[in-house]
Amino acid sequence: MKYTQKKPAIVLLEDGTVFHGKAVGKEGSAFGEICFNTGMTGYQEIFTDPSYFGQIMVAATVHIGNYGAFSEENESDGVKIAGLVCRNFSEYGSRPISEESLGAFLERQNLFVVSDVDTRALVSYIRDHGSMNAVLSTEVDNIEGLKAQLKAQPSMKGLALAPEVSTKEAYFVGDENAPYRVAALDLGIKRNILRNLAARGAYIKVFPHTATFEELSAFAPDGFFLSNGPGDPEPLTEAITLTQQVIDSGKPVFGICLGHQLIALSQGVPTYKMRNGHRGINHPVKNLLTGKSEITSQNHGFAVDKELAEKNPNIEITHLHLNDGTVAGIRLKNRPVFSVQYHPEAAPGPHDASYLFDQFIELMTSNK
């Protein structure tokens, strides 16, 4: 396999900083916003999460690929990251349920991987200087040319990427005789979200990002779900309008990550691009309604403006990130609507927040 071959490669950052490594398999160049994930496990779920579309992922954990790949752990129809940077890329994986090596899996997906990088130094650099555009390349003698190409790459701020990963056609998940019907807007939805809803008695119709309120309503849903997804939420004007329409319907609405941001935007509360974002499986969040803390899986580079959310008469902040105090959850005071800026479905990560799916079911029960 070509993923056992290694050629010299570089990680060139937007500010001109260069990190050296070796290309694992694919040659050429790959562009994207570089960021890092601190999770020690769950690489396959991370690579296939549509929320990472357009991003180069730096794995903070040392070993990648050492437990192979298993198709049931894909969170979408394929790899969504633009490239991978790691310290050690394992050619062989060992796990009873593993179907193939990660190298074989990524070779089929044609992903650009650079290994043998000092990821400890790279993660520290991104932490100190913020996420920025970068290029992975085997053109190690063409740095000036790569800099010119990199300069032409658009910033993540202002990019509407959800249309790139949304389904093209509506589809169904679950038992059509289930007690609850949920209309889900796919902005980059993860499969484990759908599994969690279906396991709790929901029959879900997943709609593309172009769906209208009339199309969602024709399904006669008991509630609406607004999914996670990549990019900047503010350019998604049609989705923001649709979000306001489903809120005005009076039916329960549950939003995760990008869906959470759309709910805030629909209420006039802006979002902003974070310096680094939150990407990992051990982020502490405090539930302000119960006083309890939970460890959560997070993946986002934008956040809801806390000061303006606090001033908004329709919004109550329900969760806060304990590391930096950013908004991690809200609910509306006048509607059965709530959302969180993290992933209660995990995949990967802890299950402390799985109660949020139960909360959605309870809201649909009480509003039937």
Please identify what each model-predicted range represents:
Residues 292-335:
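Catalytic beta-strand/loop cores that center a nucleophilic Ser/Cys/Thr
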Residues 329-367:
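A glycine-centered loop/beta-turn motif at secondary-structure junctions
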Residues 112, 181, 252-254, 270, ...:
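Proline-centered loop/turn at the N-terminus of a beta-strand
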Residues 223, 227-306, 349-365:
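Cysteine-nucleophile active-site neighborhood
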Residues 1-214, 218-219, 231-233, 347, ...:
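RNA-binding accessory domains that recognize and position tRNA/RNA substrates
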Residues 181-186, 296-297, 338-342:
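Active-site-proximal beta-strand elements of phosphoester/diester hydrolases
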